[in-house]
Protein backbone atom coordinates (compact mmCIF):
# COMPACT_ATOMS: atom_id res chain seq x y z
CA UNK A 1 0.00 0.00 0.00
CA UNK A 2 1.32 3.44 -0.93
CA UNK A 3 1.93 5.63 2.11
CA UNK A 4 3.71 8.63 0.58
CA UNK A 5 1.64 11.73 -0.13
CA UNK A 6 1.19 13.03 -3.64
CA UNK A 7 2.81 16.31 -4.55
CA UNK A 8 1.41 18.60 -7.26
CA UNK A 9 3.07 18.00 -10.60
CA UNK A 10 1.05 20.32 -12.81
CA UNK A 11 1.31 24.03 -12.10
CA UNK A 12 -0.30 26.26 -14.70
CA UNK A 13 -0.42 30.05 -14.67
CA UNK A 14 -3.08 31.75 -16.80
CA UNK A 15 -3.11 35.52 -17.22
CA UNK A 16 -6.57 37.06 -16.73
CA UNK A 17 -5.48 40.64 -17.27
CA UNK A 18 -2.95 43.14 -16.01
CA UNK A 19 -1.73 42.00 -12.56
CA UNK A 20 -4.41 39.29 -12.44
CA UNK A 21 -3.73 35.59 -12.88
CA UNK A 22 -5.17 32.15 -12.22
CA UNK A 23 -2.78 29.57 -10.77
CA UNK A 24 -3.75 25.89 -11.00
CA UNK A 25 -1.99 23.20 -8.97
CA UNK A 26 -2.73 19.46 -9.00
CA UNK A 27 -2.91 16.75 -7.80
CA UNK A 28 -3.27 16.97 -4.02
CA UNK A 29 -4.42 14.32 -1.61
CA UNK A 30 -8.06 14.80 -0.65
CA UNK A 31 -8.42 17.68 1.82
CA UNK A 32 -5.06 19.24 1.04
CA UNK A 33 -6.60 21.59 -1.51
CA UNK A 34 -8.60 23.39 1.19
CA UNK A 35 -5.79 23.11 3.76
CA UNK A 36 -3.17 24.76 1.55
CA UNK A 37 -5.54 27.04 -0.34
CA UNK A 38 -6.87 28.65 2.82
CA UNK A 39 -3.38 28.99 4.34
CA UNK A 40 -1.98 30.61 1.19
CA UNK A 41 -4.96 32.94 0.90
CA UNK A 42 -4.60 34.17 4.47
CA UNK A 43 -0.87 34.77 4.07
CA UNK A 44 -1.37 36.54 0.74
CA UNK A 45 -3.89 38.95 2.24
CA UNK A 46 -2.18 39.64 5.56
CA UNK A 47 1.56 39.09 5.37
CA UNK A 48 2.93 40.47 2.11
CA UNK A 49 5.32 43.42 2.21
CA UNK A 50 4.47 46.52 0.22
CA UNK A 51 4.55 50.33 0.21
CA UNK A 52 1.96 52.96 1.07
CA UNK A 53 1.57 56.69 1.83
CA UNK A 54 1.55 57.07 5.62
CA UNK A 55 1.75 60.83 6.23
CA UNK A 56 0.64 63.82 4.19
CA UNK A 57 1.26 67.54 4.67
CA UNK A 58 -0.79 69.87 2.46
CA UNK A 59 0.06 73.55 2.24
CA UNK A 60 -2.77 75.62 3.70
CA UNK A 61 -4.45 72.66 5.41
CA UNK A 62 -4.51 72.13 9.18
CA UNK A 63 -6.72 69.02 9.34
CA UNK A 64 -8.44 66.53 7.06
CA UNK A 65 -11.85 68.24 7.25
CA UNK A 66 -10.63 71.34 5.43
CA UNK A 67 -11.22 72.49 1.86
CA UNK A 68 -8.84 74.12 -0.60
CA UNK A 69 -9.72 77.03 -2.86
CA UNK A 70 -9.47 76.05 -6.49
CA UNK A 71 -9.52 72.30 -5.78
CA UNK A 72 -12.68 70.40 -6.67
CA UNK A 73 -12.11 67.67 -4.09
CA UNK A 74 -12.26 68.32 -0.36
CA UNK A 75 -9.31 67.14 1.71
CA UNK A 76 -10.97 63.85 2.70
CA UNK A 77 -11.44 62.84 -0.95
CA UNK A 78 -7.98 64.12 -1.80
CA UNK A 79 -6.49 61.83 0.84
CA UNK A 80 -8.51 58.87 -0.42
CA UNK A 81 -7.17 59.49 -3.92
CA UNK A 82 -3.60 59.73 -2.62
CA UNK A 83 -4.03 56.39 -0.85
CA UNK A 84 -4.91 54.92 -4.24
CA UNK A 85 -1.48 55.75 -5.69
CA UNK A 86 0.68 52.61 -5.88
CA UNK A 87 4.32 53.26 -4.98
CA UNK A 88 7.36 51.01 -5.15
CA UNK A 89 10.65 51.80 -3.42
CA UNK A 90 14.02 50.39 -4.41
CA UNK A 91 16.63 49.66 -1.72
CA UNK A 92 15.08 51.88 0.96
CA UNK A 93 12.30 51.68 3.53
CA UNK A 94 10.87 55.20 3.38
CA UNK A 95 10.98 58.35 1.30
CA UNK A 96 9.20 61.72 1.12
CA UNK A 97 8.04 62.96 -2.28
CA UNK A 98 6.40 66.18 -3.44
CA UNK A 99 3.32 66.92 -5.52
CA UNK A 100 3.10 70.48 -6.86
CA UNK A 101 0.61 71.61 -9.49
CA UNK A 102 -0.84 74.99 -10.46
CA UNK A 103 -3.48 76.04 -12.93
CA UNK A 104 -6.61 74.44 -14.30
CA UNK A 105 -6.45 70.74 -15.06
CA UNK A 106 -6.30 67.20 -13.76
CA UNK A 107 -3.68 66.18 -11.20
CA UNK A 108 -2.50 62.58 -11.60
CA UNK A 109 0.01 60.34 -9.87
CA UNK A 110 2.37 61.02 -12.76
CA UNK A 111 2.70 64.63 -11.53
CA UNK A 112 4.42 63.54 -8.32
CA UNK A 113 8.09 64.52 -8.18
CA UNK A 114 9.87 61.25 -7.44
CA UNK A 115 13.28 60.39 -6.06
CA UNK A 116 15.48 58.16 -8.22
CA UNK A 117 14.69 55.11 -6.08
CA UNK A 118 10.91 55.61 -6.01
CA UNK A 119 8.46 54.49 -8.68
CA UNK A 120 4.74 55.05 -9.30
CA UNK A 121 3.02 51.97 -10.72
CA UNK A 122 -0.21 53.73 -11.78
CA UNK A 123 0.82 57.18 -13.09
CA UNK A 124 -2.62 57.79 -14.67
CA UNK A 125 -4.42 57.55 -11.33
CA UNK A 126 -6.40 60.77 -10.78
CA UNK A 127 -5.68 62.61 -7.53
CA UNK A 128 -7.50 65.94 -7.92
CA UNK A 129 -9.04 68.44 -10.31
CA UNK A 130 -7.86 72.06 -10.21
CA UNK A 131 -9.91 75.00 -11.42
CA UNK A 132 -8.51 78.27 -12.71
CA UNK A 133 -6.15 79.70 -10.11
CA UNK A 134 -6.06 76.43 -8.20
CA UNK A 135 -2.85 75.29 -6.57
CA UNK A 136 -1.77 72.10 -4.83
CA UNK A 137 1.40 71.61 -2.77
CA UNK A 138 1.63 68.27 -0.98
CA UNK A 139 4.41 66.42 0.85
CA UNK A 140 3.85 62.64 0.92
CA UNK A 141 5.74 60.24 3.14
CA UNK A 142 5.91 56.68 1.76
CA UNK A 143 6.94 53.75 3.93
CA UNK A 144 7.56 50.05 3.60
CA UNK A 145 5.32 47.84 5.69
CA UNK A 146 3.16 44.76 5.97
CA UNK A 147 -0.58 44.27 6.16
CA UNK A 148 -2.83 47.08 7.34
CA UNK A 149 -1.87 49.67 9.97
CA UNK A 150 -4.57 52.10 11.20
CA UNK A 151 -3.56 55.74 11.40
CA UNK A 152 -4.42 56.04 15.10
CA UNK A 153 -1.84 53.34 15.91
CA UNK A 154 0.90 55.28 14.16
CA UNK A 155 -0.36 58.67 15.37
CA UNK A 156 0.40 57.85 18.98
CA UNK A 157 3.67 56.08 18.35
CA UNK A 158 6.83 57.19 20.13
CA UNK A 159 8.29 58.85 17.02
CA UNK A 160 5.16 60.68 15.89
CA UNK A 161 5.40 64.04 17.63
CA UNK A 162 2.54 66.35 16.72
CA UNK A 163 3.27 68.51 13.69
CA UNK A 164 0.69 71.12 12.71
CA UNK A 165 -0.80 70.27 9.33
CA UNK A 166 0.54 66.74 9.17
CA UNK A 167 -2.17 64.15 8.51
CA UNK A 168 -1.51 60.52 9.41
CA UNK A 169 -3.14 58.00 7.07
CA UNK A 170 -4.42 54.49 7.50
CA UNK A 171 -1.87 52.45 5.54
CA UNK A 172 -2.68 49.36 3.48
CA UNK A 173 0.76 48.05 2.58
CA UNK A 174 -0.32 44.76 1.02
CA UNK A 175 0.41 44.55 -2.72
CA UNK A 176 -2.29 41.87 -3.01
CA UNK A 177 -5.74 43.26 -3.83
CA UNK A 178 -7.89 40.14 -4.09
CA UNK A 179 -7.44 36.41 -3.56
CA UNK A 180 -9.91 33.58 -3.97
CA UNK A 181 -9.50 29.86 -4.32
CA UNK A 182 -11.56 26.87 -5.37
CA UNK A 183 -10.98 23.16 -4.98
CA UNK A 184 -12.00 20.91 -7.85
CA UNK A 185 -11.73 17.18 -8.46
CA UNK A 186 -8.57 15.77 -9.99
CA UNK A 187 -7.67 12.35 -11.34
CA UNK A 188 -4.43 10.42 -11.54
CA UNK A 189 -4.68 7.07 -13.32
CA UNK A 190 -7.36 5.14 -11.42
CA UNK A 191 -7.59 7.55 -8.49
CA UNK A 192 -10.44 10.03 -8.69
CA UNK A 193 -10.52 11.23 -5.08
CA UNK A 194 -7.82 13.89 -5.48
CA UNK A 195 -7.92 17.70 -5.27
CA UNK A 196 -7.09 20.41 -7.77
CA UNK A 197 -6.38 23.84 -6.28
CA UNK A 198 -7.31 26.87 -8.38
CA UNK A 199 -6.27 30.29 -7.06
CA UNK A 200 -7.21 33.68 -8.50
CA UNK A 201 -4.80 36.42 -7.47
CA UNK A 202 -4.90 40.13 -8.27
CA UNK A 203 -2.09 42.45 -7.20
CA UNK A 204 -1.47 46.19 -7.29
CA UNK A 205 1.40 45.80 -9.74
CA UNK A 206 4.19 46.08 -7.17
CA UNK A 207 4.71 42.34 -7.61
CA UNK A 208 3.23 39.85 -10.07
CA UNK A 209 0.65 37.26 -8.97
CA UNK A 210 3.23 34.51 -9.53
CA UNK A 211 5.77 36.24 -7.28
CA UNK A 212 3.08 36.84 -4.67
CA UNK A 213 2.26 33.15 -4.39
CA UNK A 214 5.97 32.28 -4.28
CA UNK A 215 6.54 34.71 -1.41
CA UNK A 216 3.51 33.45 0.51
CA UNK A 217 4.71 29.86 0.16
CA UNK A 218 8.15 30.85 1.48
CA UNK A 219 6.53 32.55 4.49
CA UNK A 220 4.54 29.40 5.29
CA UNK A 221 7.59 27.16 4.94
CA UNK A 222 9.59 29.46 7.22
CA UNK A 223 6.87 29.45 9.88
CA UNK A 224 6.40 25.68 9.74
CA UNK A 225 10.15 25.03 9.95
CA UNK A 226 9.89 25.68 13.70
CA UNK A 227 7.71 22.59 14.05
CA UNK A 228 9.99 20.51 11.85
CA UNK A 229 12.88 21.29 14.23
CA UNK A 230 11.06 19.92 17.28
CA UNK A 231 12.76 16.54 16.92
CA UNK A 232 16.11 18.11 17.76
CA UNK A 233 15.03 19.80 20.98
CA UNK A 234 14.89 18.53 24.54
CA UNK A 235 11.64 16.95 25.61
CA UNK A 236 9.93 18.23 28.72
CA UNK A 237 10.95 15.09 30.62
CA UNK A 238 14.61 15.45 29.62
CA UNK A 239 14.86 19.17 30.29
CA UNK A 240 16.62 20.00 33.54
CA UNK A 241 14.25 21.07 36.26
CA UNK A 242 14.53 24.68 37.35
CA UNK A 243 13.70 26.01 40.77
CA UNK A 244 10.76 28.41 40.78
CA UNK A 245 11.70 32.07 40.76
CA UNK A 246 11.51 33.69 44.21
CA UNK A 247 10.17 37.22 44.62
CA UNK A 248 13.19 39.41 45.51
CA UNK A 249 11.26 41.06 48.35
CA UNK A 250 11.22 37.72 50.19
CA UNK A 251 15.04 37.70 50.24
CA UNK A 252 15.22 41.02 52.07
CA UNK A 253 15.93 41.08 55.83
CA UNK A 254 13.08 41.80 58.23
CA UNK A 255 14.94 44.98 59.22
CA UNK A 256 13.78 46.43 55.89
CA UNK A 257 10.21 46.31 57.18
CA UNK A 258 11.14 49.09 59.63
CA UNK A 259 9.37 47.44 62.54
CA UNK A 260 9.75 48.69 66.09
CA UNK A 261 12.90 47.53 67.86
CA UNK A 262 10.83 45.31 70.16
CA UNK A 263 9.11 43.50 67.27
CA UNK A 264 12.33 43.12 65.27
CA UNK A 265 14.21 41.64 68.24
CA UNK A 266 11.38 39.19 68.96
CA UNK A 267 11.51 37.91 65.37
CA UNK A 268 15.29 37.47 65.37
CA UNK A 269 15.05 35.57 68.66
CA UNK A 270 12.88 33.06 66.76
CA UNK A 271 15.44 32.83 63.89
CA UNK A 272 13.22 34.89 61.58
CA UNK A 273 15.80 36.89 59.62
CA UNK A 274 14.17 37.29 56.19
CA UNK A 275 10.73 38.36 55.02
CA UNK A 276 10.42 34.94 53.41
CA UNK A 277 10.84 33.38 56.86
CA UNK A 278 8.24 35.68 58.38
CA UNK A 279 5.35 35.19 55.94
CA UNK A 280 5.43 31.42 56.46
CA UNK A 281 4.60 31.83 60.16
CA UNK A 282 0.97 31.88 61.29
CA UNK A 283 -0.59 34.34 63.75
CA UNK A 284 -0.79 31.67 66.44
CA UNK A 285 2.88 30.80 66.00
CA UNK A 286 3.94 34.42 66.35
CA UNK A 287 1.74 34.98 69.42
CA UNK A 288 3.64 32.17 71.14
CA UNK A 289 6.86 34.14 70.69
CA UNK A 290 8.10 35.55 74.03
CA UNK A 291 7.49 39.31 74.46
CA UNK A 292 5.52 39.57 71.15
CA UNK A 293 1.96 40.59 71.90
CA UNK A 294 -1.14 41.45 69.92
CA UNK A 295 0.01 45.03 69.29
CA UNK A 296 3.28 43.85 67.71
CA UNK A 297 1.40 41.23 65.69
CA UNK A 298 -0.95 43.87 64.26
CA UNK A 299 2.05 46.03 63.37
CA UNK A 300 3.64 43.12 61.47
CA UNK A 301 0.40 42.34 59.62
CA UNK A 302 -0.06 45.96 58.54
CA UNK A 303 3.51 46.27 57.27
CA UNK A 304 3.21 43.01 55.30
CA UNK A 305 -0.17 44.04 53.86
CA UNK A 306 1.35 47.28 52.57
CA UNK A 307 3.67 45.10 50.48
CA UNK A 308 0.97 42.73 49.28
CA UNK A 309 1.97 39.95 51.70
CA UNK A 310 0.24 38.09 54.53
CA UNK A 311 1.12 35.64 57.25
CA UNK A 312 0.62 31.91 56.70
CA UNK A 313 1.84 31.85 53.10
CA UNK A 314 3.43 28.70 51.67
CA UNK A 315 6.77 28.84 49.84
CA UNK A 316 8.42 26.05 47.90
CA UNK A 317 12.19 25.51 48.02
CA UNK A 318 12.68 27.82 50.98
CA UNK A 319 15.26 28.78 52.03
CA UNK A 320 17.02 29.06 48.67
CA UNK A 321 20.56 27.76 48.36
CA UNK A 322 23.22 30.22 49.52
CA UNK A 323 20.93 32.29 51.75
CA UNK A 324 22.90 33.36 54.82
CA UNK A 325 21.33 33.25 58.25
Swiss-Prot record:
Enzyme class: transferase
Domain of life: Bacteria
MF terms in GO: DNA binding; DNA-directed RNA polymerase activity; protein dimerization activity
Region annotation Alpha C-terminal domain (alpha-CTD): where it falls in the sequence: 246-325
Pfam families reported in the protein's UniProt record: RNA_pol_A_bac, RNA_pol_A_CTD, RNA_pol_L
UniProtKB keywords: DNA-directed RNA polymerase, Nucleotidyltransferase, Transcription, Transferase
NCBIfam families: PRK05182.1-2, PRK05182.2-5, rpoA
Subunit relationships: Homodimer. The RNAP catalytic core consists of 2 alpha, 1 beta, 1 beta' and 1 omega subunit. When a sigma factor is associated with the core the holoenzyme is formed, which can initiate transcription.
HAMAP family, A to Z: RNApol_bact_RpoA (MF_00059)
Name this polypeptide is given: DNA-directed RNA polymerase subunit alpha
Upper lineage: Bacteria, Pseudomonadati, Pseudomonadota, Betaproteobacteria, Burkholderiales
Amino acid sequence: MQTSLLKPKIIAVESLGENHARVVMEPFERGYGHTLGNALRRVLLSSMVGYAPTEVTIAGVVHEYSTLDGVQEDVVNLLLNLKGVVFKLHNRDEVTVTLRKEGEGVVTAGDIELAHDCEVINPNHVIAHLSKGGKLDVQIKIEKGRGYVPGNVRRYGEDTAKIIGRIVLDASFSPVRRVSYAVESARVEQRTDLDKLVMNIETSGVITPEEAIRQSARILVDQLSVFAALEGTETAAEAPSRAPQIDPILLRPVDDLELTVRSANCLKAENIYYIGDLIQRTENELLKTPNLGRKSLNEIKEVLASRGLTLGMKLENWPPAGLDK
